[in-house]
């Protein structure tokens, strides 16, 4: 296991170059999380609510969506826990994109706190799963067809989820204030 101390100009810890599987996966996920934090850093409500082109996607909606995704995969799916607030009272049948739409009613501080709290819960959930069965541990909530993804799969999926949304965040942030960068 290699200690990671390389931090870039945006304050992101670089993923490890030579670590074990857990360190590599969590290092890349944390790097993607840090990239997303950078893309939303310092924006006010207008910035977090801005859209671009024909999309209704906003950085504020993305903060809330990624908070939901963190909680859904690492706590609800992996550990079989009941949804945490605010997800526990959502009528997803009435609005399947509630996380995106409701963000317009939240302050920037509320959105950032919702996301950072979800990330903290996810880190704890991953640590618990690693201690209890490692990367091969299967999610407690099975899919409709009876299959269950492993923690390894969930970590890879979350890296993909953040990488995709970080591409969206790049475009949105540049349209707001011209800030660019990976």
Predicted regions located by residue number:
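Acidic/histidine-rich alpha-helical segments that form the ligand environment
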Residues: 95-137, 152-158
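Short, contiguous alpha-helical
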Residues: 2-14, 22-97, 138-182
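Short, aromatic/basic-rich helix-turn unit that serves as a nucleic-acid recognition element
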Residues: 18
């Amino acid at each position: 296991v290699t200690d990671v101390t390389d931090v870039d100009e945006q304050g992101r810890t670089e993923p490890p170059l030579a670590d074990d599987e857990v360190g590599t996966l969590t290092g890349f996920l944390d790097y993607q999380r840090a990239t997303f934090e950078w893309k939303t850093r310092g924006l006010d409500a207008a910035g977090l609510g801005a859209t671009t082109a024909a999309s209704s996607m906003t950085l504020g909606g993305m903060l809330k969506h990624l908070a939901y995704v963190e909680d859904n995969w690492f706590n609800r799916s992996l550990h079989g826990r009941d949804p945490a607030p605010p997800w526990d009272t959502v009528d997803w049948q009435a609005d399947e994109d509630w996380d995106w739409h409701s963000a317009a009613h939240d302050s920037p501080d509320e959105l950032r706190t919702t996301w950072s709290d979800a990330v903290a819960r996810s880190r704890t959930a991953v640590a618990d799963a690693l201690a209890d069965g490692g990367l091969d541990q299967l999610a407690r909530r099975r899919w409709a067809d009876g299959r269950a993804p492993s923690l390894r799969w969930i970590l890879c999926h979350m890296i993909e989820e953040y990488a995709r949304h970080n591409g969206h965040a790049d475009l949105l942030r540049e349209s707001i204030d011209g800030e660019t960068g990976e």
